[in-house]
């Protein structure tokens, strides 16, 4: 398991956006699809060699 602390990244983003109380919509860079077709998962998977 890998633990990544994103707090420094969020703090930098808030400072660069100059927003006093940011919401998730301010910090999200990519629009997430609510409805995803199961066949699209295969195109987004990255093979991991064993």
UniProtKB/Swiss-Prot annotation:
It catalyses: GTP + H2O = GDP + phosphate + H(+). One of its GO terms (cellular component) is microtubule. InterPro entries: Tubulin (IPR000217), Tubulin/FtsZ_GTPase_sf (IPR036525). GO terms for molecular function: GTP binding; hydrolase activity. Its cofactor is Mg(2+). Coiled coil: none annotated. It is an enzyme of class 3 (hydrolase). The active site is at 40. It comes from the Eukaryota. Its main location: cytoplasm. Its EC number is 3.6.5.-. One of its GO terms (biological process) is microtubule-based process. It is found in: Cytoplasm, Cytoskeleton. Belongs to the tubulin family. Tubulin is the major constituent of microtubules, a cylinder consisting of laterally associated linear protofilaments composed of alpha- and beta-tubulin heterodimers. Microtubules grow by the addition of GTP-tubulin dimers to the microtubule end, where a stabilizing cap forms. Below the cap, tubulin dimers are in GDP-bound state, owing to GTPase activity of alpha-tubulin. This is Tubulin alpha chain.
């Amino acid at each position: 398991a890998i633990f990544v602390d994103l707090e420094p990244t969020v703090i930098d983003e808030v400072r660069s956006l100059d927003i006093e109380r940011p919401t998730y919509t301010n910090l999200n860079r990519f629009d997430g699809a609510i409805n995803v077709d199961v066949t699209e998962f295969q195109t987004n998977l990255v093979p991991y060699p064993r």
